[in-house]
Amino acid sequence: LLMLSFALLAANLTQAQDFDRREYRAVWLTTFLGLDWPKGHDPLTQQKQLCRILDQLQAAKVNTVLFQVRLRGTTAYASDIEPWDGIFTGTPGRRPTYDPLAFAIEECHRRGMELHAWMVAFPVCKLNVLKALGTKSVVRKHPELCRRSDDQYIMDPGMPGTADYLANLCRELVSKYDVDGIHLDYIRYPEAGLHFDDAATYRKYGKGRDLKTWRRDNVTRVVEKIHEAVKSQKPWVRLSCAPVGKYADLPRQSSRGWNARDAVGQDAVMWLNKGWMDVLFPMMYFDGDNYYPFVLDWLERAERGTVAPGLGVYCLSAGEKNWPLLTLQRQMNFLRTAEAGGFALFRSDFLTNNTKGVYDWLAGEYTTRPVLTPPIENPQSTLPATPRATLTRQGYDLHFNFPTGGIHNIYIREGKTFSFLGQTATGHFTYRPALPARLYAEYAVRAMDRYGCESQPAFLKIGGEIPSLKDTLHVADLPIDVKAFWICDAFGRKLRTVDATSTIDVSDLRPGCYELRTVGRKGGSHRVRLFRR
């Protein structure tokens, strides 16, 4: 066992790009009708198959699982408000012998992935499911909040009680489970093709507003109530939604009657800019002029928060739109060029089944390294303290140990960038480099809070503790073949050249980590020492 002492130095970052850019790499995992959920009702089989799905997502460097927990007025978790969905046991309302959401949270966190609880907001259930659920259904408990729409029931956003009901549902979930986010789906009015009669509600509550404005205000009221409920319990839980893929008509491109703001009452841009949403995943299952200009429109309208467009992996299927893989590749490459906040893929089964080679391309070329999700606003506005740690080398393994609790991120220097290696919340992280030479690379560690906000980095190098200096650096046994010294920063960039003397003035250096290197008469250079100011 070889003990290596490291100096952990706080240093001001000179450029944000010195560390990997963060982005959402999300996947929708649909439990409704078992679309992405394991087949059969045996609990152990479900758990094993779910773990295999999560293993595949982890291997593709996915960092966020949008796990469907409220399906259609039924749940994938233990709720005192709504009944269990039948996909887990075969019988609607019957409790399974384990908690699927609790299990999924534990397994996602074990793999370093976030789990956002995906909740379908207004649609509740089909008529056949209503019959099976009986008095357990929200349709029977709160008939005043529900409207029949063809062969299903939909909650009426115009009824004031709808906002309170959904807010209470989200409050219960957040208080019981360690979810990383709440993700709202169908947080909108039905499309025009569905019959939805809210005329009586409009007459009672419209108060002189036109129908479109009134409907938009109703959905916004629900969003605001849910935001208050979630953030009052756990302000670090991320709130997101999946709006219709086009926000509004563009000056030179029509949405063809299908947009979020004007067609279905989703003013998602306002929700994001007011801070009621942390993330938007607009469902952009289009191509060409129906995709590219609308991506830019979302990004240009966002004044805060993150926009990570949702892309249709299912569109590759021959049974759907039968897109060539190149179409999706171009769309995803465009998101990087446009500096979007990441992406979300719909849906898991089409990805893990490698439809038209999409999984191989994603894991092998597009998401080759892990990254963190973007941070959200911390109302306290205080960053974590720069961490201190010890590190042990055992064979080809490096063991990072943090004496204080909390979340810590580990990075390795590659050129001028520090790339994300991994994260620990246990106080210990083990790294085995692919090449033994990387044992001697430069590392950085950063503490992180639940909001995703990181501390200033501490830089780690093998070679003994780095001394802290005030104004003067002393060099003992000055080499005779040295004509000068370089003073370099923590990234190896040369800051200045100084005379080869035994006493060097460093009083004007900013606090941080530095390296002193020789400049040989024959052109060579070697490290003399590390020091900090």
Q: Where are the regions a protein language model picked out?
A:
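Active-site-adjacent "subsite" loops/lids of carbohydrate-active enzymes
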Residues: R22, T30, G34-Q47, A117, ...
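Short, surface-exposed loop/turn motifs with a glycine/proline- and acidic-biased composition
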Residues: P436-E442, F491-R496, A500-K522, R527
